[in-house]
Amino acid sequence: MNKFSSVWVFSDTPSRLPELMSGAQAVGEKVNAFVLNEADSATACHLGADHVWLLSGKPEDRMIEDYAAAMAETIRQHSEGGAVLLPNTRRGKLLAAKLGYRLSAAVSNDASDVSLQDGKAAVKHMVYGGLAIGAETIASPFAVITLSSGTFDAQQPDASRSGEMHTVQWQAPATAVTRTATQARQSNSVDLDKARLVVSVGRGIGSKENISLAEALCQTIGAELACSRPVAENEKWMEHERYVGISNLMLKPELYLAVGISGQIQHMVGANGAQTIFAINKDKNAPIFQYADFGIVGDALKILPALTAALAR
């Protein structure tokens, strides 16, 4: 497989770093990682970074993405081309845009596949709501790419690995957003990417209060709770970070238990990587049953308590 001579990685979300590092090693010869603190420096080395660049000196009232100027200058000084891999988080995409401008590079978001073909970056991602795969070839020397969750398997750390350490000093941008206050968001977010068992609820659960039935099942079998996009975005019953689908989480658990989820393609793109899909839906014609390995047609409000009781024995 052809590889980029140099790949640069940064993740604003620590849980996404192992996957990004795995991707960087799969497509790059030399792996560089930008990090925000000393602890992340060691982690990046153990995950396979050849060079670790510690971002330092940012004032407390400035945003992480304001490191873009210093990052771009570092990338230009130490490579003539290559790929920059970021998570497809909100901050990841904002930083991608800033780096793309400063590196005169094309930016591709939500990539599900990255490779080097004929000396150019080849990127694939979902289009038309998950109904098709779009393929792009990036002609610019640098390619800035945000990766969808689950594109690569997470890299396992190796404490025996080491890399060369560097420091990148803060450069104040000409214009910047200044943070005037910070308020912690109330969230019970969990790293669903690593969950072995996932119970996911859709609007078929009926109400926010009924989600407690799925939570009880999760506690019984040691699963994590997820949801469909309408539950998070429309009904506001659960956090945005928990919804599965093309524009958010792409999961690959051993078991995905879909409760009251119709099974539209936009959702299933994020769930179809599961080893086993189990569906509960009162509509026997729901699309979810076309994807499910096992299914029950019936009222989830009756089935969930019975299933929880049976599995608790």
Curated annotation (Swiss-Prot):
The keyword Transport applies. Pfam families: ETF (PF01012), ETF_alpha (PF00766). This is Protein FixB. PANTHER family: ELECTRON TRANSFER FLAVOPROTEIN ALPHA, PROTEIN FIXB-RELATED. InterPro entries: DHS-like_NAD/FAD-binding_dom, ETF_a/b_N, ETF_a/FixB, ETF_asu_C, ETF_asu_C_CS, FixB, Rossmann-like_a/b/a_fold. Belongs to the ETF alpha-subunit/FixB family. Heterodimer of FixA and FixB. FAD binds at residues 255-283. Pathway: Amine and polyamine metabolism; carnitine metabolism. It comes from Salmonella typhimurium (strain LT2 / SGSC1412 / ATCC 700720). Required for anaerobic carnitine reduction. May bring reductant to CaiA. Keywords: Electron transport, FAD, Flavoprotein, Transport. It comes from the Bacteria. GO terms for biological process: carnitine metabolic process; fatty acid beta-oxidation using acyl-CoA dehydrogenase. The keyword Cell inner membrane does not apply. One of its GO terms (molecular function) is electron transfer activity.
